[in-house]
Amino acid sequence: MRIENKQNKRQHHLLIVDDENNIRKILQTRLTLLGYSVSTACNGEEALKIFTTHSIDLIILDVMMPKLDGYGVCQEIRKESDIPIIMLTALEDVLDKVTGLELGADDYVIKPFSPRELEARIQSILRRIQTRNAKLKPYDNINLFKTGSLNIDLEKKQIYKNNELIRLTEMEFSLLELLVSQSGKAFSRSKILKEVWGYKLSKHEPIADTRIVDVHISRLRAKLEDDPTNPTLILTARGTGYLCRKLIT
C-alpha cells in the first residue's frame, strides 16, 4: 500500500518491511505525516517485488519474517542497490546485530523501539546524503584522489580499484568521504557516528553502538584494501578511532 503527500514536490519514498501489522500501520501513519511517501510489505518476498517496481530511497527492514527474512532481503538488495537500509531487530545477541551490518545494512534499531528514535535515524541518514550532494562542486580537483591502485572521485561518487568500479553503499561512501576529505586526521568512533550517521550523542540521546562504525570500516577495508588484515589506506588510530592516511589530490 502506498500513501503520498502531494504537497511535497520531492518526497522520499520509504519502504517499511515488517510482519507485524501494528508496527507497519504506526510507522506508515507517522512517516506519512512527516511528508514521506510510504510503501509497506509484510514479508521479504513482497518487499523485493515492491523494491523492483518502485523507486525506493530508504528501507526499514525487520529481521524475523516469514518466507524470506530480513537478512535474505538485505543480501538481494545489495546485489544491485546501495540505498540506505535500517534493520529492525528483536534479537539482542551481538552476533545477530553485527550480521545485519556485515550483510550491508547501514544501521539498526532494537525492538521495542521509540518511533521518534527511528524517525530521527531516517532523517539523519537522508539529510546526510542530501547535504553531501549539495556541498560537492563539479570539476573541483580537491575531490579527486589517487593512491596506489585506487582512484577516488568524491564528486562523482566513484571509486575505481585496478580500473574496476567498486560499489559502496550510501553510508560506506559517506564514511569514506569523511576520512578521505580530511586525510591524516583521526576521528573517534563517537565523532564518526555524529558526522556520518547523524547521532547527536547528547545526554538525552540513547547510547549509540560504536560497533556500527567498526563493521563499516571492515566493509570498506574488504572492498578497498589489497590486504584488509594489513590496511594501508584506512588505518586504526590506537586509542582514538580511525583515519585515512594522508593523501595528495
UniProtKB/Swiss-Prot annotation:
Entries under Gene3D superfamilies matching the protein: 3.40.50.2300, 6.10.250.690, Winged helix-like DNA-binding domain superfamily/Winged helix DNA-binding domain
BP-aspect Gene Ontology terms: regulation of DNA-templated transcription
KW Phosphoprotein (keyword) present: yes
The entry's keywords: Chloroplast, DNA-binding, Phosphoprotein, Plastid, Transcription, Transcription regulation, Two-component regulatory system
KW DNA-binding (keyword) present: yes
Free-text function comment from the UniProt entry: Probable promoter-specific protein mediating the interaction between DNA and RNA polymerase.
Xref: InterPro entries: CheY-like_superfamily, OmpR/PhoB-type_DNA-bd, Sig_transdc_resp-reg_C-effctor, Sig_transdc_resp-reg_receiver, WalR-like, WH-like_DNA-bd_sf
Residues carrying 4-aspartylphosphate: D62
UniProt DNA-binding residue ranges: 82-100, 142-246
Domain Response regulatory, residue spans: 13-126
Localization, UniProt: Plastid, Chloroplast
PANTHER family, per database record: OMPR SUBFAMILY, REGULATOR OF RPOS
Molecular function terms, GO-annotated: phosphorelay response regulator activity; transcription cis-regulatory region binding
Cellular component annotations (GO), alphabetically ordered: chloroplast; cytosol; protein-DNA complex
Name of this chain's protein: Probable transcriptional regulator ycf27
